[in-house]
């Protein structure tokens, strides 16, 4: 379980990114967070693995505080958290296989991984992960030779090879076309269902949130204004999240035909 206890984030310029967030996400959930740009979605997501440090409160993972964790303890906790970015975050000149093996770095010494000395078991896991997202044939291609959708699937394979217990996906389909968007989200959903990996995804599209989430969390101005099951997320609720009906109506356009 991931638990946010009175979590707030204030940036150096005084902007409040998060305001007294109290939230529990159970193991195996597929949670989609929605809200306008600047609502606090990325800040909340990235605070889980401390890519963004909070200024108040505490974040617990399986009863252990990642907020207070240091050194080896922090590295161990981060090893269980896979991160998927909008920009893919791949080493473009490296092969797909090497990018996926980067998910194993936290399990070995720096020297060993720098020299690329991964055991046979890691290689097998990397190949299995690529097969899982239907991109095994690209294992020896350079990452920059792949389409955007293929690169994002490499990112998912990296999280699988990492054997992550939690996957955080920050706007993973924002730069993708509708068909590729469906493929990437289908992969994330199937992995969540098959392996029970807790998955938190930030999305702008209300239609996609309704299609894939088991639970939707709406943020507005750094605060949670909605937290409920998909069937509870009515148009009226989304109007509250997005602040005005015109914006809501635009976002309600079907993203995947």
From Swiss-Prot:
Binding site for ATP: 35-42
Catalytic EC class: translocase
Any single Gene Ontology cellular-component annotation: plasma membrane
Record keywords, A-Z: ATP-binding, Cell membrane, Membrane, Nucleotide-binding, Phosphonate transport, Translocase, Transport
NCBIfam families, per the entry: ABC_phnC (TIGR02315)
Family indicated by similarity: Belongs to the ABC transporter superfamily. Phosphonates importer (TC 3.A.1.9.1) family.
Oligomeric and partner information: The complex is composed of two ATP-binding proteins (PhnC), two transmembrane proteins (PhnE) and a solute-binding protein (PhnD).
Protein name from the UniProt record: Phosphonates import ATP-binding protein PhnC
Protein's gene: phnC
């Amino acid at each position: 379980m991931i638990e946010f206890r009175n979590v707030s984030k204030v940036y150096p310029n005084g902007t409040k990114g998060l305001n007294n967030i109290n939230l529990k996400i159970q193991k195996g959930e597929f949670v989609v967070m929605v809200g306008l740009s600047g609502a606090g979605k990325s800040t909340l997501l990235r605070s889980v693995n401390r890519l963004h440090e909070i200024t108040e409160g505490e974040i617990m993972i399986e009863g252990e505080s990642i907020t207070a964790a240091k050194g080896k303890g922090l590295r161990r906790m981060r090893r269980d958290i896979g991160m998927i970015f909008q920009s893919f975050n791949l080493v473009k000149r490296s092969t797909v296989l090497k990018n996926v093996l980067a998910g194993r770095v936290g399990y070995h010494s720096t020297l060993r991984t720098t020299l690329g000395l991964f055991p046979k078991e890691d290689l097998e896991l990397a190949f299995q992960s690529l097969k899982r997202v239907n991109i095994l044939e690209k294992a020896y291609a350079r990452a920059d030779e792949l389409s955007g959708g293929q690169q994002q699937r490499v990112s998912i394979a990296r999280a699988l090879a990492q054997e992550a217990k939690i996957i955080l996906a920050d706007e993973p389909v924002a730069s993708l076309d509708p068909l590729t968007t469906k493929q990437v989200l289908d992969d994330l959903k199937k992995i969540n269902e098959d392996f029970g990996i807790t998955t938190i995804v930030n999305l702008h599209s209300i239609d996609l949130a309704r299609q894939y989430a088991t639970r939707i969390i709406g943020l507005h101005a750094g605060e949670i204004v909605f937290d409920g099951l998909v069937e509870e997320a009515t148009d009226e609720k989304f109007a509250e999240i997005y602040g005005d009906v015109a914006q809501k109506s635009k976002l309600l356009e079907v993203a995947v035909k």
